[in-house]
Amino acid sequence: MFREFAQYSPYTSDQHAKSLASWEFVTWVLTQFDSVDTLLQDIETIRVVSVFDTYMKAEQPLHFFVADATGHAVVIEPINGVLKVFENPLGIMTNAPSFDWQMTNVHAMIKSLNPESTIMWQGMSIPIRTEGNGLKGLPGDMSPPSRFLQLAFAQATITQPKTSSEAIVAAIRALNRFCISEGMSVKNGTVGVTQWEVFADMTNKLFCYRSYGNMTLRKVDCNKITFDGKKITKHDIEKDKTVIVDVTNMLH
């Protein structure tokens, strides 16, 4: 979410043909483009406008992370009524504030850690230490800026996976750092939790996910789906509960 920062264009009837509500933007991207580059060629042809969502009973303050199978990733944010595009060399995003602020914060944190030794990664100097001290000094709270820092450094130090399964496991371990459980985030009587997590293998077109009520990892193989149908297919991610495997009989 991009609360307190999202600023959409005002809706005007003469611009109706190229206007999208915030929740329509993702569908537009996925159905019209096959790469980030082709999206960026047409990004200025549409406007994301201010629309009240009657279901959520609010305007949806969104920003967007877009990546393709080549690894090209960008963040798109509605600021002052304009869609601003930021190249995303880290391939990560959290909630507000703006992406450029988050990147400035990462650079500031790198300097403050005063590393004993460093590696260069994605053009950035990343501290490497032993005995678990490499991330000493990173904030551990669940705020979006802190989560951004934690994920940036966790991703920078992950051993390069050799298989799809290894990559998904590495992603799970990275996100485990800041899964928000009930009671950790309460605002105005509303309890905030990490409702679901998704892990996409864009090379093999696999979409894995788990939810707050079902931590069993589930997979959707997009190679087996026909995307030219006219019916929207749905699945309740909380329909089943976590599978706990009984290995008692396997003990020896």
Q: Model features per residue range: what roles?
A:
Residues 35-36, 40-77:
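Aromatic- and glycine-enriched pocket-lining scaffold segments that form the walls
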Residues 21-52, 164-171:
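Proteins synthesized as precursors that undergo proteolytic processing into mature forms
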Residues 10-11, 74-77, 84-88, 209:
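Short helix/loop capping segments that flank catalytic or ligand/cofactor-binding pockets
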Residues 1-2, 65, 75, 199:
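Structural recognition of the beta-strand scaffold that forms the well-ordered cores
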Residues 6, 68-70, 80, 202:
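Short, flexible loop/turn elements at secondary-structure junctions
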Residues 51-52, 59-60, 69, 91-252:
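C-terminus-biased signal that marks the final domain/tail of proteins
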Residues 1-33:
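N-terminal accessory/precursor segments of enzymes
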Residues 6-8, 81-83, 213-217:
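Short, surface-exposed beta-strand-loop junctions and turns on beta-sheet-rich folds
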